[in-house]
Amino acid sequence: MLNKIKTLQGYKLSGLDGEIGKVKEFYFDDKHWTIRYLVADTGNWLTGRQVLISPYALVAVIKEEQHIIINLTKKQIEKSPSLDNDKPVSRQFEETYYTYYGWPMYWGGPYMWGTYPYIVRDRDKWIKANKLGKTWDPHLRSTHDVNGHDIQATDGEIGHVDDFIIDSETWAIRYLIIDTLNWWPGKKVLVSPRWIDRISWSESKVFINLSRETIKQSPEYSEDSLITRDYENELHRHYNKPGYWVDDLADTVLPS
């Protein structure tokens, strides 16, 4: 299911033994464009530290009740490796964090989730997963910080990042919502991270290998409507790009 980040912000987080807080923001990596951590606002509990929840612990998003189910207890979260509010998420912290929970490390292979292109819940496969694959160095970004970044087409600016649309099964970022208000009023469009050429973090700018006119003529995105596969097919046909679901299908040939 596809969900907007801004919609998920404020959702209650329901652990195995009660509510632990609400969704504050997310961290994603800029290689696979996949959510790596949900950042929880725990109120007066666990103050002074970032409470990070990996998608391995996210069981389901219940939109009707505006909450996310987590398969962790409060004690597990409280005893987890601590990261101060003003500290970045380092590789050393991630290794300690993943070791604590016993999850396979997502940077341990070529796919979105290491040895696999999706989150594997079978613990028997986790030990093998951690022994396979070439590791890579993740660079994590905050969805809150990237909001507002300018979008640079091949022939000029077209707007800015307004939000992200994620797939709550794989926790991949499927689209960036681009607000083109400063260029042509009243229209928002979707752009896949796969179409991004590069990102200048120092300039807060995202470079896309598409022209402004091509983007302008793309199927309009309405925040009031659900994103259907028919709409996605139309969008990808317009840009003459293969859908992410094609690659996802190819990636299902996995190590046994």
Model-assigned labels for residue ranges:
Residues 1-256:
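Peripheral interaction segments used for macromolecular assembly
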